Swiss-Prot record:
Record keywords, A-Z: Chaperone, Repeat
Name of this chain's protein: Tubulin-specific chaperone D
Name of the gene encoding the protein in the UniProt record: tbcd
Species the sequence originates in: Dictyostelium discoideum
Region (Disordered): 1-32, 453-476, 859-880, 1437-1480
Function: Tubulin-folding protein; involved in the first step of the tubulin folding pathway.
Length: 1480
């Protein structure tokens, strides 16, 4: 037998292992799908969950914290499946059974034997007892979480349900519940006392006399309970949790339905009826309580509980009272419920508002829930005739509940109870008139099936007429009242109430006769779907109506003749959307409409639904692709899939669409609007028309900007498929909407027009555009420019849309020489000439005023030549000039010029793109070229002189968008543009210094640089110049000028309130320089294959020499060591590409290229990330061994080492330590590297900038703290002068920056390190200068905090207090001054001790500095001390002062102290330079 058990165990273990392997295989196979769809397809943490549960029940936790951590992890894993709980089903038994067994063996049985800790054979320690109690408590908690995620109905089925378990579990439930109630009472009482105490009420008057003696006991015994509840109740093993009571009640609810009499389990239950004679409580004297009476008594108490305990006891009571042997108790319980409801209603009517009102509401909720569950699960005949008194009391109490503030919960339970009462009142037979789908025989045709259905319906109607009349007579009047209440709730504001009402409608109508049921359905259709679904409809009513119709359809109660009315309503509901300002309402309505479509698909036969199938499916496809909300798209996809599956062959291309546009793929909005649109658009007969109609009439005008942009892209893709239909049917409808008063309509129409034109250009279908359409599009620009909305709110979107239209117009090359003033609107008459003349005169006056204003502020105004001639000619020529201004080209030019000066960055970029295309397409005539030259000159002046930042930003963008190739600009003009752009990058004047202008200028220099390189390669191929002539060419010099400019731009470290904005310039400059290198290498390869006879090889080495490459690489390494992760990532990726460039010709003049390739390998780890400093910095620091990269890289690392981020400092230090540890095997090389590293530090201190002073001080201190460099200072080596010079440089820096408090505070640690660490060393220079630096900081009269910290460092010294000169008193005097003086006091209190200290330490230089830098108001000082003896006497007798001096200066000193205290505020002395503040 044992062998067989072993074999079975081994086989089970093998099966478990195989299942784990299979699970791992499933995980690997489903991993890709799970990542793509963001949906879980299996419980990935199942093995971990099993291990944690096993560890919990076997009490393997070593301490309480570990147990809490593991429990938290278990709960976290389970909570992840809250939206997909069914994935847990296969694991539930493996989780719940061990937990229930653990609770049963260690808690239930032990508790009933009163031997929780003493019956075990081994004595448990206190820690083990705590672990056991907390493990039991956490087991209950885990089971509750499972019930929350998966539902208690599923979880409770897995509990143990042996009859023998009933009494032990019930006993433990009673114990646990009473403990829970007592704990809550004690907490409430203590809370009341604490609130009264804080309110100032006398506790002696508040506490009753009989309670006074108990108060100390309560405080002593239960204060711990209350405190633990406030801190962390759920992890206190001595406190009963509500989860325990909840789970035990569910367990008893399973055990009470055992098919045995309670008397067979408990002798006290033999007299159940007599015991329950008084309401079933069994409280008679000397009488044993039965099981039922115990449960009833406990349940009635728990129905008013505020927690989830109420729900579990409601389930328990409903199952208990529905037992066949509990008829009497059931009637008594209903009677008790009626009396309780009446009592609560009477208290409310008598205005008896007291503290028990909340308990009354909770009790009513518990009663309603119990009755509803009992009516649902019980036998209908047991409740007949229904207690009308109960019904009346429930309807009366509804008014009280609606005013209680808990309407949502109570009304839901109220509706559930009402529908159950109605179901009991009605006959229990389902409606014979409902539609029932027949199974279609294989050989029958659809027409024959319709005939059969009609015959069946007619026969049923004839046979059931008399029965229907009888049923109508038997319908109680209360059903009308219930239906009226439910119909009102269909419009409720809460979704959960509408859902409950919809289900109630379906259940009740299913029991009604046909006439009455048809009336209810008619009311739903007429009352719920009122008004327009886009303007003024009630979203709640539409949502409730869709849900109700769906529930009716599922049950076949929506007869086929109603589909003619229902289907149009469904289609309207699929697109329900009401705009409310910056948002819209209607997603829940659209979702419910998809649910209704799903219900229709499941209910009706093909022959019934076929006339409506195609319109429903088409609209479902539209919703699944283009709805804004992901849940609506997925619901529509699921409904469409149901249509295809249930009605195979009737949905055109259904299988193809379902497989491509499935439930998961429509979840991605971009994918739906792009790739799926292209796929659906191929079905031009069935789906293309409705898709393009929806996009062109609804979606491009959506209130959401992102939807408008995506919809315009979809129209672009559909135009590729059927351009003729778009141009002829939809473009004429879209163009007029550019003149709408709504911003989102104007913007959407502009985007759609632009995308349509671009699509026509890409597919060579421009000929489809008629002249009329072209003129309509051109007129939109003219009309929009003159609108008020253009310059008001939303003007940015309109400008962007118009710029996109202009870009597309230039792309398809419209004729822009036409005079738009000659084009009249269809409704326009000739009588408007007077208005046109007045408008023209007004425009002329405005232009003159602008010109006058611009001349006064020395601002160039950009106008076309026609406008300039207007201002210079006589008034007789005004009309001709105005007509010139109406030419399309001039209108577009002026429009784009205006947008270039707009403050919005996106408007400027779109305008510059349109400008570039405008001149490249329309620059053929000399007049246009001269206009271009004027424009360039004007924008160069704007970039140089205009103080308007927006204008300079636009000008810097435009100068890079010039048509260099088509205009054949001269070298002088090109050089002028380059010089102005370079000047804008290095502006020092705050009025002209602008980060956006610098970024735009660099982008423009990139375009110009590419154009110049093209010229160089082109000229070299044509002329084949010698290398010397090539180096002397103007174009090459201009390119080198741009290269050097961008190299200098990498030093931009500007800071403003947005942070390190200079990083934008540094990043872009590096990218542009790298793009230049890539362009040269690419063209070098192409030129070598085409021109073999060239005397000069335009290689990368000739165009960019070794010095330029080295400087660029050094700069990249410097940026790679800086603190910004993004800059590091960009710089390191450029270095990697430069080293491993894949072109045939690589860059050979990179210093130490082969060694660098060994460090920065070609194929890095998949998970490697330059952003993570713990991975990137160790790799970067390996480059420190190359001397040419040492200084720049270390300079960049100082930004990280001296930063304020702790993790960045630690990673930098660890990386440098790791770098030096790589030379541990070679002491000589290690020594050399440390020397070179130290020299680099010295060079940095010699050349440090104001920006890097503070990071340099912090970096040197952090480096010295590693103790790597100590031997250079301790040993008498020649190299010790390096750190002596570093110390001297640091001293000079703080001596010249005495007003920079942040620098002074950061320098204290550095100088104290030199002073304390090396005070016992023989290096007198280090000791003297570090002491001198600390004394200099101590002498700072401006910042008390600096003096305080400096004095704290001096107190750590031992050298100052040791007698080295034979003088016994000097060290003690120094110690007395340092320790006894409060150095953060006011200046007048510390000035004398300070001078005395400096005199004792022979720091005459610092004494001179004190006299040269007095305080703001002179402080009366004592007569000068001329000897050491006099000083000693003064220190030993500090109170020996002249009385006259004190009396005469008393008032003056008080005034001085007051003034000094006022003037020495910290905020008044902060540095004015914001860069210093940003560094901190």
């Amino acid at each position: 037998m044992e062998n067989s058990e072993d074999i079975s165990l081994n086989s089970s273990e093998k099966s478990i292992e195989s299942s784990v392997v299979n699970l791992e295989d499933q995980q690997q196979s489903q991993q890709q799908t799970q990542q793509q769809t963001c949906q879980k397809t299996f419980v990935q943490e199942a093995p971990e969950l099993t291990i944690l549960i096993d560890k919990l029940i076997q009490l393997k936790h070593s301490n309480k914290d570990e147990l809490i951590s593991n429990t938290t992890r278990i709960i976290y894993i389970i909570d992840q499946y809250l939206e997909q709980p069914t994935l847990l089903d296969i694991h539930l038994n493996d989780i719940i059974q061990p937990l229930i067994n653990f609770i049963k063996s260690n808690y239930i049985n032990n508790s009933n034997n009163n031997n929780t800790t003493t019956t075990t054979t081994t004595i448990m320690t206190e820690t083990e007892i705590v672990i056991k109690k907390l493990s039991i408590k956490n087991s209950f908690r885990i089971i509750y979480v499972l019930s929350k995620v998966r539902g208690f109905k599923t979880i409770v089925k897995l509990f143990q349900h042996e009859a023998i378990d009933l009494l032990p579990v019930l006993d433990q439930l009673e114990i646990s519940y009473h403990q829970w109630v007592n704990i809550n009472k004690q907490r409430d009482r203590l809370n009341e006392i604490s609130v009264s105490y804080s309110s100032g009420i006398n506790l002696k008057n508040y506490i009753k006399p009989e309670e006074e003696s108990e108060q100390e006991v309560v405080d002593e015994n239960n204060n711990n309970i209350n405190n633990n509840h406030n801190i962390d109740d759920e992890y206190n093993e001595n406190i009963i949790s509500w989860e325990e009571v909840y789970v035990l009640a569910l367990w008893v609810s399973l055990l009470v339905i055992i098919p045995f009499k309670f008397s067979s389990l408990d002798s006290a239950s033999s007299g159940t009826a007599s015991a329950a004679g008084d309401g079933g409580d069994g409280d008679g004297d000397g009488q044993l309580k039965s099981i039922s009476s115990r449960i009833l008594k406990l349940g009635k108490l728990a129905l008013s509980d505020v927690s989830k305990i109420r729900d579990s006891f409601s389930e328990l009571l409903s199952k208990l009272l529905n037992r066949p042997d509990m008829k009497f108790e059931q009637k008594q319980f209903i009677k008790w419920c009626t009396n309780s409801i009446q009592l609560i209603s009477n208290n409310n009517n008598n205005n008896n508002q007291n503290n028990s009102s909340n308990n009354n509401i909770l009790l009513i909720i518990g009663i309603y829930s119990t009755l509803a569950t009992m009516f649902k699960k019980g036998n209908r005949l047991d409740f007949l005739p229904i207690d009308m008194n109960l019904y009346e009391k429930i309807m009366e109490a509804n008014k009280y509940l609606s005013l209680s503030g808990s309407e949502r919960i109570t009304k839901k339970i109220f509706l559930k109870l009402l529908q159950r009462i109605a179901i009991i009142m009605l006959p229990p037979v389902s409606a014979s008139w409902r539609y029932q789908k027949i199974i279609k025989p294989l050989l029958l045709k659809g027409e024959l099936i319709k005939q059969i259905n009609n015959n069946n319906n007619n026969n049923n109607n004839e046979n059931n007429n008399e029965e229907g009349e009888e049923e109508e007579e038997e319908i109680p009047e209360e059903i009308d009242e219930i239906l009226e209440e439910i119909m009102k709730s269909l419009k409720d504001k809460d979704t959960i109430i509408r859902w409950t009402s919809a289900k109630a409608i379906g259940r009740i109508v299913n029991l009604l006769p046909k006439d009455m049921g048809d009336q209810v359905i008619g009311l739903v259709i007429d009352q719920m779907f009122e008004k327009n679904e886009f303007i003024d409809a009630d979203p709640s009513a539409w949502h409730g109506g869709c849900l109700a119709l769906a529930e009716l359809a599922r049950r076949g109660l929506l007869l086929p003749e109603r589909l003619d009315v229902v289907v149009p309503l469904v289609i309207r509901a699929l697109f329900f959307d009401i705009i409310k300002g910056t948002y819209s309402i209607g997603s829940h309505v659209r979702d419910s409409a998809c649910y209704l479509c799903w219900a229709l698909a499941r209910t009706y036969h093909n022959s019934i639904l076929s006339p409506y199938l195609l319109p429903i499916c088409r609209n479902l496809v539209v919703v699944s692709l283009y709805d804004r909300e992901i849940n609506c798209r997925k619901s529509a996809s699921a409904a469409f899939q149901e249509m295809v599956g249930r009605h195979q062959g009737l949905v055109p291309n259904g299988i193809e669409i379902v497989t491509s546009a499935d439930f998961f793929t429509v979840g991605n909005k971009n994918n739906s609007f792009t790739s799926l649109t292209t796929f659906i658009g191929k079905f031009q007969i069935d789906y293309y028309p409705i898709v393009i109609k929806h996009l062109a009439t609804i979606k491009i005008y959506n209130w959401d900007l992102e939807i408008r942009q995506l919809a315009s892209k979809s129209i672009h893709l559909l135009t590729n498929i059927n351009p003729n239909d778009i141009v002829s049917n939809y473009l004429p409808l879209i163009i007029p909407n550019t003149q709408s008063d709504l911003v989102h309509v104007k913007h959407g129409a502009s985007l759609a027009i632009s995308e349509i034109l671009i699509s026509l250009f890409e597919n060579n279908n421009i000929n489809l555009l008629s002249d009329n359409l072209k003129m309509m599009i051109l007129m939109t620009i003219k009309n929009t420019k003159n609108e008020k909305l253009f310059k008001g709110k939303g003007g940015v979107l309109i400008r962007i849309g118009m710029c996109k239209i202009i870009y597309s117009i230039c792309l398809v090359e419209f004729s822009l020489d036409k005079n738009l003033s000659e084009i009249k609107k269809p409704t326009e008459s000739t009588s408007t000439n007077g208005n046109e003349d007045r408008a023209a005169a007004l425009k002329l006056k405005i232009a003159m005023l602008k010109a006058k204003t611009a001349s006064q502020i020395n601002k160039p105004i950009i106008t076309p030549p026609s406008s300039k001639s207007t201002t210079n000619n006589n008034n007789n020529n005004n009309n001709n000039n105005l007509n010139d201004n109406e030419i399309a080209f001039n209108i577009i030019l002026g429009y784009l010029n205006e947008n270039l000066n707009h403050p919005n960055e996106e408007v400027q970029k779109e305008a510059s793109k349109a400008f570039e295309l405008l001149f490249s397409k329309y620059i053929s005539s000399n007049e246009k070229i001269s206009l271009l030259l004027e424009l360039i000159d004007s924008h160069c002046k704007t970039l140089k002189f205009d103080i308007n930042r927006s204008a300079r930003r636009g000008s810097s963008l435009l100068l890079g968008s010039l048509p260099f190739n088509s205009a054949n600009l001269s070298y002088d003009l090109l050089s002028k543009v380059v010089n102005e752009l370079i000047l804008s990058i290095f502006q020092d004047d705050p009025k002209f210094k602008d980060i956006e202008t610098r970024v735009n200028s660099i982008s423009s220099l990139y375009k110009i640089g590419i154009y110049i390189l093209n010229l160089i390669f082109k000229n070299q191929e044509n002329e084949q110049k010698e290398e010397e002539d090539f180096k002397k060419s103007k174009n090459y010099n201009l390119f080198i000028k741009i290269w050097n400019c961008l190299g200098l731009a990498t030093n931009d470290y500007s800071i403003d309130k947005r942070g390190d904005i200079g990083s934008w310039v540094r990043e872009l400059s590096c990218k542009v320089l790298f793009d230049f290198i890539k362009f040269i290498i690419t063209n070098q390869n192409s030129s070598t294959t085409t021109t073999t006879a060239s005397t000069t090889d335009l290689s990368i080495e000739n165009l960019i020499n070794e010095k330029m490459i080295t400087e660029f690489i050094c700069k990249l390494f410097q940026l790679s060591g800086e603190k910004l992760d993004k800059i590091r990532d960009v710089a390191c990726k450029i270095i990697h590409e430069l080293l491993w460039i894949e072109n045939p010709s690589s860059i050979n003049n990179i210093p130490h290229k082969e060694e660098l390739k060994k460090i920065i390998v070609k194929d890095q780890d998949v998970h490697f990330n330059w952003f993570r400093t713990e991975e990137s910095l160790p790799l970067i620091c390996k480059v420190l061994k190359f001397n040419c990269y040492l200084y720049p890289l270390l300079f960049g690392l100082f930004s990280s080492l001296g930063g304020t981020s702790k993790y960045l400092i630690n990673d930098s230090i660890q990386s440098i330590k790791q770098y030096f540890s790589s030379f541990d095997n070679d002491e000589k090389e290690r020594f050399e590297k440390i020397i070179s590293f130290s020299k680099a530090i010295l060079e940095i201190t010699n050349n440090t900038t104001q920006r890097m002073i503070q990071p340099t001080f912090r970096s040197i201190y952090n480096l010295l703290s590693t103790h790597i460099f100590d031997f250079l200072i301790i040993n008498n080596l020649n190299e010790q002068s390096i750190f002596e010079t570093i110390l001297f440089n640091c001293y000079q820096i703080i001596e010249s920056n005495q007003d920079d408090i942040y620098l002074l505070l950061n320098s204290i640690e550095l100088f104290s390190y030199f002073f304390i660490q090396f005070e016992n060393n023989n290096n007198e220079y280090i000791k003297d200068y570090s002491l001198k630096a600390l004394l200099l900081l101590l002498s700072n009269l401006k910042y008390p905090k600096v003096r305080k910290l400096a004095s704290d460092q001096l107190k750590k010294s031992t050298r100052l207090f040791i007698n080295n000169n034979g003088d016994d008193e000097t060290p003690s005097l120094i110690k007395s001054l340092i320790f006894n003086t409060k150095w953060d006091d006011s200046v007048d209190l510390i000035i004398e001790p300070l001078k005395s200290l400096l005199l004792l330490l022979n720091q005459k230089h610092l004494l001179e500095l004190l006299s040269e830098n007095p305080t703001k108001k002179p402080i009366p000082l004592a007569p000068p001390i001329t000897s050491i003896e006099e000083l000693k006497d003064k220190i030993q007798n500090p109170h020996k002062q002249s009385d006259d001096n004190n009396n005469n200066n008393n008032g003056e000193l008080i005034n001085n102290n007051t003034e000094n205290n006022n003037n020495n505020n910290f905020d008044d002395n902060l540095p004015e330079d914001s860069q210093d503040l940003m560094e901190i």
